[in-house]
C-alpha cells in the first residue's frame, strides 16, 4: 500500500484510496505536556479511524497539524494491518517556552515589557501562532510610538532549550536626502529652500 510519509510524497500523483483502521500519534511521550500535544495533533486531523483517504487528504492533515502551531516537525508512516492501514503520525513538539530575549539589547522597548507580553506563556509549550500574535503586539508598540519602519522577527529555527531570541530593527532613519523631481521625472534644482522642507519634517 502506498501512503505518504512526508509532504513531498503527499504531493505525488498517486491517488490510491486507503482505509485507515487505526491512528497512532508518536513523539510526544517525553514532553512535559505530551498528552495535550497528542490530543492537539489528533484534533487537527480530519482523518479518523474508518476514514478512506488518499494523498490529498493526507497532505491536508499534515498541513493542519503544522498549522496548529505546536509542532516543528510532522511525518506520516503507514503499516499494513488485517483491517486496513495503521497510520502513524510522528510529531516533533515545540519546547517549553522558558525565556524571550531581544537582540540588540539596547532597544527602546524594555525587557520588562517583553516579559509582560509573554508572561502567561512561560512554562508552557511554545505555540508558533501565539508567538506571531505576541510579535505583532511588539510591532504595534513601536508603531504607536511613531516607529513605522520597525521590524520584529522571530527565530529562524526553534531550539530545544526553550530560549527564543527576537531580532528587532527599530528602523531609525540615519539620513534624509531631499531631491526635487521634475515632470519629466529627472532631478531638478528646487524652488523651495531645503531648510524649509527639513523644518516641516
Language-model regions, residue ranges each:
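Periplasmic polypeptide-binding modules associated with outer-membrane biogenesis and secretion
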Residues: 2-201
Amino acid at each position: 500500500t502506498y501512503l505518504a510519509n512526508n509532504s513531498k510524497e503527499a504531493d505525488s500523483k498517486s491517488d490510491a484510496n486507503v482505509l485507515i483502521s487505526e491512528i497512532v500519534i508518536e513523539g510526544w511521550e517525553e514532553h512535559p505536556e505530551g498528552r495535550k500535544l497528542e490530543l492537539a495533533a489528533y484534533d487537527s486531523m480530519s482523518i479518523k479511524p474508518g476514514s478512506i483517504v488518499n494523498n490529498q487528504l493526507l497532505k491536508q492533515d499534515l498541513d493542519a497539524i503544522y498549522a496548529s502551531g505546536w509542532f516543528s516537525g510532522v511525518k506520516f508512516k503507514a503499516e499494513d494491518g488485517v483491517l486496513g492501514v495503521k497510520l502513524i503520525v510522528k510529531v516533533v513538539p515545540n519546547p517549553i517556552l522558558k525565556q524571550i530575549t531581544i537582540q540588540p539589547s539596547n532597544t527602546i522597548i524594555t525587557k520588562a515589557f517583553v516579559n509582560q507580553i509573554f508572561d502567561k506563556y512561560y512554562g508552557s509549550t511554545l505555540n508558533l501562532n501565539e508567538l506571531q500574535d505576541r510579535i505583532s503586539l511588539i510591532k504595534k508598540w513601536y508603531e504607536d510610538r511613531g516607529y513605522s519602519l520597525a521590524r520584529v522577527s522571530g527565530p529562524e529555527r526553534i531550539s530545544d532549550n526553550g530560549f527564543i531570541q527576537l531580532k528587532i530593527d527599530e528602523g531609525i532613519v540615519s539620513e534624509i536626502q531631499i531631491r526635487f523631481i521634475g515632470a519629466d521625472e529627472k532631478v531638478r534644482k528646487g524652488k523651495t529652500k531645503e531648510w524649509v522642507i527639513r523644518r516641516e519634517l
